[in-house]
Amino acid sequence: MSEKATGEVEAELPEHPDADERRRWQELADEVREHQFRYYVKDAPIISDAEFDKLLRELQALEDAHPELRTPDSPTQLVGGAGFATEFAPAEHLERMLSLDNVFDSDELTAWAARISSETGDAAHFLCELKIDGVALSLVYRDGRLERGATRGDGRTGEDVTLNARTIDDIPERLTPSDEFPVPAVLEVRGEVFFRVADFEELNAGLVAEGKPPFANPRNSAAGSLRQKNPAVTARRKLRMICHGIGYTEGFTPASLHDAYRALGAWGLPVSEHTTKVSTVAEVAERIAYWGEHRHDVEHEIDGVVVKVDEVALQRRLGATSRAPRWAVAYKYPPEEATTKLLDIRVNVGRTGRVTPFAYMEPVKVAGSTVGLATLHNASEVKRKGVLIGDTVVIRKAGDVIPEVLGPVVDLRDGTEREFEFPTHCPECGTELAPAKEGDADIRCPNSRSCPAQLRERLFHLAGRGAFDIEGLGYEAATALLAAQVIPDEGDLFTLTADDLLRTELFTTKKGELSANGKRLLANLTKAKEQPLWRVLVALSIRHVGPTAARALATEFGSLEAIEAASEEELAAVEGVGPTIAAAVKDWFTVDWHRAIVDKWRAAGVRMADERDASIERTLEGLSIVVTGSLAGFSRDQAKEAIIARGGKAAGSVSKKTAYVVAGDAPGSKYDKAVELGVPVLDEDGFRRLLEQGPPVEPAE
């Protein structure tokens, strides 16, 4: 034990995680991100909310027990859609668009309310809102006119879906003037886009009549409809919207969220008629119980009740974590169950080679939507649950959203059922399947180099915003390039030509010419060659190497050649890297086909070294600086790059070695840690002075 300068005795440090705990952390982080990708990008989740929440909670518990495992790239620190590329233009939110933390029972709700009370006393009132099962949308109005609509994305940058948003009848092009509430100069308003149950059923009936597959549930259909490339398709679908919050504003400073909703309604924006303001946790519990009994009385699907502190001043005091406000929580209802016939079990190969069995069932109505597909996780889970093909099974929709198979109704068996035989070879490439190591429950395809399923995922990954940021190389494009055998692997991506793309239907017009999307892809590939070194490192799909570690390595070594030549000890000594990442980097470069990818990219002109701008003075040489919260003049990446360009280290966590913490709006726990450790805290103006002049800079008040 040690003593601080103040004489306080510090608590004992947590134990370091052992190898098994580190391995489990990585497995959980990878699995959570894979499921987030399927949910936020493909609109096709494969596990229930309950299972996802269980994985995320296990990951959170590991990090709580061993804080050194917690990285800025961890799913516990990010909004759900972070780091996934799309084919829509990026749109930066004026203020962060966060997610929500969940509670599942009265004890957890009471614990959340107790934390609120400890900070605010009895001053807080609560709003109880229905948690609509849809897709989040942010609208920006300037001088009363709709300027932009964007999806949540990673909370800082979403997808620009303005044209599609304009087709939704509930969204006004202009705000209606009000004597009580003057229209503000700037209004960023958040809401949920959804289908009413009747409209969803009508949409699916139409799709089936046209010979097209129906949507699995209203949430998926809302997300898919909002993200249509052709706004005319969106316009034909009866999307609705309800506003449930505000972001950045100019000329509008409501004292409470309740007042904000009154103003939104006065301006012609859609707000819920079911929102209730209460004073006590007991009243909150009453509203939750009421809607638990009446959730199917609403015209749209709900999967819980959102509880928010009403007073804006108290919201600011409570702040937010990196992914969710502390002043709001979603109470999620228990799942609903139904029985149906299990027709077949088939497998799917994921990005990491994991082979997952799926249950194909007779469609059944549960929790307000029709379900015909559910995950069975792995072969061990199939055996554990004792399900046979042909069984009548119990399925559950956790959170009223995603189905899972609970088990068979054994009494209904008639002797025609048969056991599921897990395939011995990969259904995509034919390679013999095996566990990654002895004792693993998951079976994997070891053909990581050329398995089409894994290669698709790697192509999609390297095109993401956290890597090369190649617009136009989405999931559909990656699939088309591989299906046409235009490229054998990602190493050949940067030598693509117009003739190559003409071999794919996706990039060819009816006249046999290169499409506009094909031309854009070639232009974006050329542009991607000039991306900084850290993005190249992320794009290589080296295990454990995310943007934070990649930046640290790029800053320290300056070139890919130097990184490859460095010893494991030299790599591990870099702040933000450590022994696990160092070992993964060294292991990666021992594989011949990995090095071949680097050689091909280098030959194609991909930048493999960073050139420092000599005009920028190294005013921050050796200083470790942490940025937290939203800055008006910098995106998170821009702030980090400004620090690195001046010789500083853009750290992800606060320690006694931190020189400064830059705090924007809603800074969260890093600000608290800085105050606790006595680290100087700068506002945005102070940050600008630091960049221009270097230290010392006086902390903000």
From Swiss-Prot:
Enzyme Commission (EC) number: 6.5.1.2
Domain of life of the organism encoding this protein: Bacteria
Catalytic activity: NAD(+) + (deoxyribonucleotide)n-3'-hydroxyl + 5'-phospho-(deoxyribonucleotide)m = (deoxyribonucleotide)n+m + AMP + beta-nicotinamide D-nucleotide
Active site positions: 131 (n6-amp-lysine intermediate)
Gene3D superfamilies: 5' to 3' exonuclease, C-terminal subdomain, 6.20.10.30, BRCT domain, DNA ligase/mRNA capping enzyme, Helix hairpin bin, Nucleic acid-binding proteins
A UniProt-annotated Pfam family: HHH_2
Region called Disordered, residue ranges: 1-23
GO molecular function: DNA ligase (NAD+) activity; metal ion binding
Domain BRCT intervals: 615-701
Residues at which NAD(+) binds: 49-53, 99-100, 129, 152, 192, 308, 332
Record keywords: DNA damage, DNA repair, DNA replication, Ligase, Magnesium, Manganese, Metal-binding, NAD, Zinc
GO cellular component terms listed in the entry, alphabetical order: cytosol
Residues that coordinate or bind Zn(2+): 426, 429, 445, 451
Co-factor requirement: Mg(2+); Mn(2+)
Disrupted-gene phenotype: Essential, it cannot be disrupted.
One GO term of the biological process aspect: DNA repair
Similarity comment: family membership: Belongs to the NAD-dependent DNA ligase family. LigA subfamily.
Classification via PANTHER family: CHROMOSOME TRANSMISSION FIDELITY FACTOR 18 (PTHR23389), DNA LIGASE (PTHR23389:SF9)
Annotated function: DNA ligase that catalyzes the formation of phosphodiester linkages between 5'-phosphoryl and 3'-hydroxyl groups in double-stranded DNA using NAD as a coenzyme and as the energy source for the reaction. It is essential for DNA replication and repair of damaged DNA. Probably the only ligase required for non-homologous end joining (NHEJ) repair of 3-overhangs.
Name of the protein this chain belongs to: DNA ligase A
Annotated organism of origin: Mycolicibacterium smegmatis (strain ATCC 700084 / mc(2)155) (Mycobacterium smegmatis)
Lineage start: Bacteria, Bacillati, Actinomycetota, Actinomycetes, Mycobacteriales
